[in-house]
Amino acid sequence: MNIQGLTIAYKQKVAIDDVTLQIATGKLTGIVGPNGAGKSTLLKGMMGLVPREKGQVTLDNKPLTYWRKKIAYVPQRSEVDLTFPITVFDMVLLGTYPALGLIKRPGKKEKQLAFDALEQVEMTAFSKRQIGELSGGQLQRVFIARALAQHAEIFFLDEPFAGIDMASEALIMKLLKKLRDNGKTIVVVHHDFHKVAAYFDDIILLNKKLVAHGPVEQTFTEEKIQFAYGDAPVAFAAGV
């Protein structure tokens, strides 16, 4: 996946400034940086969910939007209307819709895919619950299940571990590593320094501009972190 000169601005204020990099296929890549660095904006800009001032994102010489059906997106929980009357099962079933198109409705095959995805995140017992009745960790598992039901090749996740229980985080991380091992490409906005080395193959260190990008052991260094965070207090945790 190639990102070339990506620039994004809100109300004439630059949020992402001329970012160019290449994300490796079949890797777990984390986007790391201080608050306000543009991490979520970069993720959304790559998918075309926010307007770009300039730049392009391509895969196999085609715009990333061309591959929309092969891309699964897990948003931040705050972006989801939890009052919407939809059950856990139906939420996961939505993951099968991209492959169906506009006319077809989910059948037996799609329902089995949704059930299998719920099994993987250990949420079958909650299938008839309304999504608004779930805890943060349970809801995040459901979002992951929806992505699994899509059978995507590329997964974008925006702060999937924020405010969830440790058991849910461990289960989700195990699933992401399994997807990676099966050749899927996964990009995660992340904030916990202590887990970067354990979770990711590569990282994108960002502060509106690209500070560094590459394998964790080469990129997640004290010098580069200090450059990204400036005077903000940061406890260096590479290798932890």
UniProtKB/Swiss-Prot annotation:
UniProt feature coiled coil, ranges: none
GO MF entries: ATP binding; ATP hydrolysis activity
UniProt name for this protein: Manganese transport system ATP-binding protein MntB
Keyword line: ATP-binding, Cell membrane, Membrane, Nucleotide-binding, Transport
Entry GO CC: plasma membrane
Membrane-crossing segments per the record: none
Cell compartments where the protein resides: Cell membrane
Species in which this protein is naturally found: Listeria innocua serovar 6a (strain ATCC BAA-680 / CLIP 11262)
Positions contributing to ATP binding: 33-40
Gene: mntB
